[in-house]
């Protein structure tokens, strides 16, 4: 049976390394499902969850919060390079919820003061916090 090898790497090191039968990601161009023998390609990832169906158990799915990055698919090897990534089991949801509140306050403050760059950064922080919360709740 054909399989994929999935590796997710951040500046801190290897976050994920397993075999899979299916991987789902969201690129800047939209959702993408990847099966073995997928065409080789490179794409830019959005801040979103990565879904990995493990080869060793058809009912076992791993969820990983990825904060953007790049995905390379080459000869059934999927490599994701991201600024940060966390497996669902490693996410501290209460910490992510606090980050969400901080980001929401920062957005309001930036809008009140018409600080466009700060507002943009705060919106990205909010998106990342929401992504972590969503993935953390997948367990």
UniProtKB/Swiss-Prot annotation:
Its main location: membrane. GO terms for cellular component: plasma membrane; proton-transporting ATP synthase complex. GO terms for molecular function: ATP binding; proton-transporting ATP synthase activity, rotational mechanism. Keywords: ATP synthesis, Cell membrane, CF(1), Hydrogen ion transport, Ion transport, Membrane, Transport. It holds the Pfam family ATP-synt_DE_N. InterPro entries: ATP_synth_F1_dsu/esu (IPR001469), ATP_synth_F1_dsu/esu_N (IPR020546), ATP_synth_F1_esu_C (IPR020547), ATPsynth_dsu/esu_N (IPR036771). Induction: Induced by a decrease in external pH from 7.5 to 5.7. Produces ATP from ADP in the presence of a proton gradient across the membrane. Belongs to the ATPase epsilon chain family. This is ATP synthase epsilon chain. It comes from Streptococcus pneumoniae (strain ATCC BAA-255 / R6). The gene is atpC.
